[in-house]
Amino acid sequence: MKKRVVISGLGFITSIGNNTPDVLASLREARSGIEIFPELPQEPGYPRVAGTVKGFSFPSTTFDDWTWPPEYTIERTQLRSMCPHVVYAFCAMQQAIAQARLGPERVSHPRTGAMCASGGSMWMIYEHLHVMVTRGVHKCYPLALPAAIPGTLNSNLAADFKLKGAVLGFASACASSAHAFGYGYDQISQDRQDVSFIVGAEDCNLHSILPFTGVRALSLVADPGKTPAPFDAKRDGFVGTGGAAVVVLESLDSAQARGADIIAEVLGWGEAADGYNVMAPEPEGEGLARAMSSALAAAGVTPDEVDYINAHATGTVAGDLSEIKAIRRVFNGTRVPQVSSTKALTGHGLCLAGAMEAAFTALALKNRFMPISAKISQLDPACVGVPVLTKPVGEEPVVAISNSSGFGGANVSLVLKRWE
């Protein structure tokens, strides 16, 4: 028999808050974390804004120059193999462990692991390759490689928190940490682990954001109050962000035995590939529709039981429309759930997005509200028939879906339920 899986802790370093109370307030009040980002070229034809991470500074690749909020202690021996997003994740992990009330013996246990996702640090890779090319490989920092590669997240967290269970890294572009969440759920529901930390993280700097200008994916709107605008008729692309989110998944048996404060239950998940294009989403939303249908079947939930969808919608014309069509496919002939994209507030966190938005969805369920889709001045007519939330409603959601999609047509849907 499958074990029931719950969420017992959350940790946030995000553009809309660096702790659960601040993130919750931002979601309730539609408080945006988008700002003018001086690292980006402040001239026409370039993105100028980002979902900035406050309270941290990384002026160079020399870790002695880095600063972070004073409530966190990070030893020099730990910093040596880190990059910015690992620092974010280290802090978010401490929050999640504290909220879940996990002691050291439970964290460092053979049945406690972590499922992680990041794109690595393009900034660290660039800077250290520059040293190798201009000065020679023997002038390179010895720990440059483990500090920069995508596996830096899981390897650092495993070492620093003495994790002894299953620790994996995932790479499916912007669906990565949603995949991590799904496979973490499987580890627990199949009784292979008792606890799994789901971690999504990304740098927030020029090197992690600007390259998407080359594929015409980024918004060029210079007003942080107007972009990104998922589902808006005049949306022009996504806005980059970074940070970290940690979700503690735990078996219900383990959480109840410890007297944990349960945030939400995870009912199941689904995944599917578009099989269409290395970058563009399948126009009719067929792959995402299959992921949602698979998730609902695994969760034992019918479409008309779903109250809310936290959409992947990033603010691109093609991506948002594909998701709307996917929702229509799945909820054809039934009550269509309320839909919103919290990326209007945070920006798009790439490999961070899935874990971050699943955590947002869990918070919304626990606190009985649905975040709105902000910055919509005129709803895209293509969304007609799908109730995109542009203002708060009194309905209290019980069952919700969190969607994620990535380059190459990777699609993941997670089904969560309010804990009663």
Report each predicted region and the residues it spans:
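ACP-dependent fatty acid/polyketide chain-elongation machinery
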Residues: 1-75, 253-265, 359-373, 417-420
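Glycine-/small-residue-rich "gating" segment that lines the acyl/pantetheine channel
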Residues: 134-141, 182, 186, 190, ...
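Acyl-CoA/ACP chain-elongation machinery
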Residues: 38, 43, 192-236, 269-283, ...
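Condensing-enzyme catalytic core mediating Claisen C-C bond formation in acyl metabolism
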Residues: 4-8, 31-36, 46, 223-299, ...
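Active-site pocket-shaping loop/turn-to-helix segments
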Residues: 15-17, 21-22, 73-91, 140-149, ...
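Conserved small-residue
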Residues: 9, 27, 93, 114, ...
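Active-site-proximal alpha-helical scaffold in enzymes
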Residues: 89-102, 150-153, 158-161, 166-201, ...
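Conserved beta-ketoacyl condensing-enzyme motif
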Residues: 7, 28-172, 201-209, 303-319
